[in-house]
Amino acid sequence: MSASRFLVTGASGQLGRLVIDGLLKIVPASQIGVLVRGDKAAAEFAARGLHVHKGDYGRPETLTAAFAGVDRALLISSSEIGQRAVQHRNAIEAAKQAGVKLLAYTSLLHADTSPLGLADEHRQTEAALKASGVPYALLRNGWYTENYAASIPAALAHGVMLGSAGDGRIASAARADYADAAAKVLTADTQQAGRTYELAGDAPYTLAEFAAELSRQSGKTVAYQNLPEADYKAALVGAGLPEPFAALLADSDAGAAKGALDDASGELGHLISRPTTPLAAPIAAALASSR
């Protein structure tokens, strides 16, 4: 492809680092810029030959400098829930001023119709993108399998995996799958502006099936216990999670019970030209890291 200049915002996060790894397989480091907040991440990326910009979504002046001269950018959604819509608008405005030719945004699976509370700020951001006039692509990412894998140590300790997803099927995928998709969209020779991708795993599962796979791999019996949303939230708070985060997780599980995290389009596997990472792999990785 031609020597486009790329920018990845939020590059020091778990998804961002994987996107950079994917881009480096396709284009040279000299064409890639990153937006990071910390000195350590800035030094790490500079050592890899990338163009480093320090700043964040809450400081528009830093965004203007980062987007200058960029052809294609990935706006990774902020982790600051409740402030994301404003922060994302700052980034969109900077991209508009810079004349960015494609701004890809990591949204949420079926964001326009999703019952998840998490979808609200994604809908606001999508609306801002559409109103901005900036050519955009929506990467509506489903759930990360790693989100559930993070609960494995507690599940093994207590012999039970709690949730409120009922029999809802969850078409999650590994972060690396979504990262590869983002890298493919950013570097595609085909027209991407105006595209909306509903991205999810190939093999949906229930949390009971997750618990069964965990039991199989660990050799310990782990049962799935379904709770009402309020009780699950209370259990998470009791385990030490901040109340807002506990509420978000419980709401997401309740949404999963309604089908909000399921999808059968196969778009993610098609986009990355391979099957998405099977459920067994992140569970195995989590077990290996806990030993």
Question: Could you tell me what each predicted segment is?
Answer:
Residues F45-G58:
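Rossmann-fold cofactor-recognition segment
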Residues A230-R291:
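A hydrophobic C-terminal alpha-helical subdomain
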Residues K40-A47, A288:
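Polar/charged alpha-helical tracts
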Residues T62, R72, T277, A281:
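Residue-level recognition of oxygen-bearing side chains
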Residues S2-A41, G58-E61, A66-A68, S79-R89, ...:
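Oxidoreductase cofactor-interface core, primarily capturing Rossmann-like NAD(P)-dependent enzymes
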